[in-house]
Amino acid sequence: MMEQCLDQNQEFVDLITSERLCGESSNRSSPSYDASGSFLEKTKNLFCSGVFLKGVAHAVGFWNPRKGLRALMAIIVLFLDVYYLFEAVYYAFLCGHFETPLDQWMCPNASQNSSSTHNIPVLAFLHGVELVNILSLVAYLAVLMSNTAFFWCMWNMKCHTSNCMTLEKAYSSAGRSLWVRLNCTLLLFGFSLVIMIVWFNLTFKGLFINNLSISLGIIPRLATLTSCFLFSLITNAMKDCVTSCQAEIRNSINSSLDDIIRIHKHLCEQIFCTSDSLKPWFAIHWFLLAVTAVIYVADMVEFFHKNATGWYDFYQVTLISAIYLYAFVYPSYCAASVTSRCNKMLKELNLTSNDEWDTGHPFHSRTQLALFIQYAQYTDCGFRAGEVTFGSNFAWFSTLIAMCGVGVKVL
């Protein structure tokens, strides 16, 4: 009897469960549920992929399999860079001092006083140039040189595909967490720049050509940010190579010390080849953005007090300063993280005791491990800028340089 009751209860439970499952399946099969679930899933997958960064990189000419389109977009971006540098030079040294046919486009707000400036001494003329105009000139020069150097490095990296970490390899090895972080930063700066342009066009009514010129100014800055994101993508792939090297070393059973050294040597060749290919951009970008970041931070408060007329000026100066600070500091930390990961691998190998290695592994003998650690330390494997390995000390030094602007202003 008890068994019959249990069987009946089990049938009743199975019936209820089947009805619930049918109800849930009917709800899930409804068009509204499928549409919302599919949309959320596609949005999640899109946000965890490199579609945004790859699209922006194609748009600014940094990354495109078709060389013709890549060269065309690069020419457009570099033309804008040169134009804004010329505009900054013109506004700083000619507007209000000399009268030319370009004044109506280049000098919308400058007062013309050309008659009194033809015979003044050069030092007096330079003394009359405002600091904010020099600041703009230095910033556009840094953007032009940085973008040009990155174009050059990406174009020439194809010649070293055997050992170098190219964008294609880095793109295929990137994980979801990296894409989420890069997409968040990219969308944050992108939307902030778009808000700045929309705000400007709604607030200030001027000539169409002037508004268009200011609106297109976000493209060079976006290209500079994109180069930093692509550099982060490459350095992340370099760190993955270190992880793979460490795993290969640990699994090298029944091998000799020379075999382990060859594995590590191949890793160093990959890192050195990639860092040498990016060396022109990294050196130019680091130096010029350091100068720009220090000047912007040092002059930001004073510029706001003297020139700001509302919330737009505060938003613009703060956003541009944040962009230059990020573009200067972030690549330094990316480069230092590669060297730090190499040192961490050696530290973890050194902390492994003899009994943790397999019997056939050469590092089962502590003497062999000590010889390898000594060899690896002399190789100084890590991200190199010239003959200098860029480690964590340089990253902190970059942060100190960025903070020097605040110190200069306080003093």
Task: Give residue spans per PLM region.
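Inner-leaflet juxtamembrane helices
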Residues: 147-164, 228-244, 324-355
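Terminal membrane-anchoring module of integral membrane proteins
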Residues: 3-83, 258-411
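Short, isolated positions within intrinsically disordered regulatory regions of eukaryotic proteins
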Residues: 67, 109, 156-159, 183, ...
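Short intrinsically disordered, low-complexity coil segments enriched in acidic
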Residues: 1-2, 174
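Helix-loop-helix junctions within predominantly alpha-helical proteins
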Residues: 81, 85-146, 159-230, 243, ...
